[in-house]
Amino acid sequence: MKVPPCFPSLPDADILCIEVISIEKGMSSTDQAAQVYQLRIWIRHISPQIWRRLLVRSDSTIAQLHDILQIAFGWRDEHLHRFLIRGKPYGIARSGGMSFDDNPHQVQLRDFHFRSKETLVYEYDLTDWWQHEIRLEQVLPLDPTKRYPLCVAGKRRGPLEDCGGPRAFMDLQDEYPLYKVLPQFAQMLLDHRDDLDDCQGELRRLAYWIVREDFDRRAVNRRLVEYSAGQTGEKGSSHAYSDTGDH
């Protein structure tokens, strides 16, 4: 390589180093190859644990991760939320709620360069205060035969919305054991068989405690597919993203 006149004293190796550094500094996050983050998420202060294992693209934004978690745990996105990442809050600003320094539709997960086993927190409903702990279990290569995001494991249904938070939820678990709920549910169906519309709310509440141990991973993945295809209006469809392949 011929040494340019502006660097008369630099050897060829130093020039190459300068060129590489310049290229790396000029790379944006969109220039980096996407990977897959395997995340394990659980709700704090709940026993038995309610948890999910998700595969999420590293180029997912904070806003997209919010939507994904809402779907994975069955939340309705009716309350304020925030992420706490290394002590700094992130999230989608809402009228009358918190404001954030960074645009959640632009900040990508890979921008943080998370280490394996590193954790962050997702808080939802700042009155009931559901705290979801998120741990990066491992970083995987992108599989072109799979569609992301993808739920690969989990246990138990997400809590009832507006039930009062973890402590109240634990008390309700004791208050509604299956052997009590099943007769109540059956009796209500009999008593209101001609006007079930009048007791839909109570029936749904009782039904939750009947099936609370069940987790329908396939149903979650169907919703995630709809979300990634931009078909789910209630959970961030304007920020949807997808990958090729089926699961």
List each model region and its residues.
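Short linear regulatory motifs enriched in tryptophan with gly/pro/ser
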Residues: 7, 11-247
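Extreme N-terminal basic, low-complexity initiation segments
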Residues: 2-6
